[in-house]
């Protein structure tokens, strides 16, 4: 499923603004933020790093390795300030810096958010930059990140009913009403629904079978 047009437009608008911008991009499980980021970055200069659940030291090491690999540079220090000072777009175009699952590093290492704040204020990278802190943790996005970067949150919403109708354009509306009532408008769930199969077959295959893609999903949200 392609990213929602409205979500792409919001990011594109931020990208077009002059100066540096920062957005905390978040949404529930299945919101497909990775797909949105991939589509948005198409044709742009960007640096992407996905954080892991790791110790502060290991996280720092892994991001440094990615910086060195992508930009072919030798880092004199292992600090986030040093890392953000070495990124580059290679031209006048705005650079997009994406730190995915940022809560994993922000919660364990205060120097990361301090470096992000300096990056936004032009104290590390001289060129224009759009910083995207992406996360699947709604709590972190709306509390901790929101406290430091007030007003920067961008929530990825589920599809509304009309958008789901457009997604299943080959199905009768009555059938789509049943689908929407069962799994809502979560993009990842809708992608798993086989429009060629009956409603009953899909529910049995996805929801009721222990090996189904959506089995137990309600408990995991």
Residue ranges with predicted function:
Residues 1-221:
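Phosphate-binding site recognition
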């Amino acid at each position: 499923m392609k990213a929602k047009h409205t979500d792409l437009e919001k990011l594109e608008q931020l990208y077009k603004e002059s100066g540096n911008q920062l957005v905390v991009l978040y949404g529930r499980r299945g919101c497909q933020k990775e797909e949105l980021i991939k589509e948005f970055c198409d044709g742009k200069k960007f640096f992407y790093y996905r954080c892991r659940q790791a110790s502060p030291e290991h996280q720092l090491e892994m991001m440094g390795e990615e910086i060195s690999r992508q930009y072919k540079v030798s880092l004199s220090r292992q600090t986030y300030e040093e890392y953000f000072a070495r990124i580059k777009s290679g031209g006048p175009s705005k650079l997009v810096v994406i730190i995915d699952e940022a809560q994993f590093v922000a919660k364990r290492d205060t120097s990361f958010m301090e470096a992000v704040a300096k990056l936004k204020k032009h104290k590390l990278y001289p060129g224009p930059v759009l910083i995207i802190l992406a996360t699947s943790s709604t709590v972190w996005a709306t509390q901790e990140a929101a406290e430091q970067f007030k007003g920067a949150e961008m929530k990825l919403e589920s599809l509304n009913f009309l958008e789901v109708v457009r997604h299943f354009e080959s199905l009768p509306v009555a059938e789509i009403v049943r689908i929407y009532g069962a799994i809502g408008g979560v993009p990842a769930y809708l992608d798993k629904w086989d429009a060629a199969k009956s409603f009953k077959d899909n529910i049995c295959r996805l929801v009721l079978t222990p090996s189904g893609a959506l089995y137990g999903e309600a408990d995991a949200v």
